[in-house]
Amino acid sequence: MKLIKLVTSAFIAAGLLAAAPAMANLDLAKKSNCMSCHTVDKKLVGPSYQDVAKKYAGNKDALKTLSAKVKAGGKGVWGEIPMPPNAAVKPEEATKLVKWILSLK
């Protein structure tokens, strides 16, 4: 019985540790106002992050391209509504956000 509780506790702890970075990146997206136009799984004003991840899967320049778009904004890729620039996001935060987004396939 103690072994079962120990194993169960270990699995729960491992799950929480694995979820922590994802939650931290979601929090960063919220703090950076990204969630005003994007959601993880549904189109809002801009594309869902899952759609972005699918579109850029296998693109070796995706991290660089999307990190630049987070900072400078962009237009024409997902329709007529432009993505505004977000100068308040630091370059390392943009990279962190994009790595997270690309992991959401």
Could you describe each region identified by the protein language model?
Residues 19-21:
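N-terminal signal peptide c-region/cleavage motif recognized by signal peptidases
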Residues 23-40:
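Sequence/structural segment immediately N-terminal to covalent heme-attachment motifs in c-type
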Residues 28, 55-60:
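Conserved helix-turn-beta segment immediately C-terminal to the redox Cys motif
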Residues 35, 59, 63-64:
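Domain-level signature for proteins that mediate thiol-based redox and metal-cofactor handling
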Residues 36, 45-56, 69-98:
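Axial heme c-ligation environment in periplasmic c-type cytochrome domains
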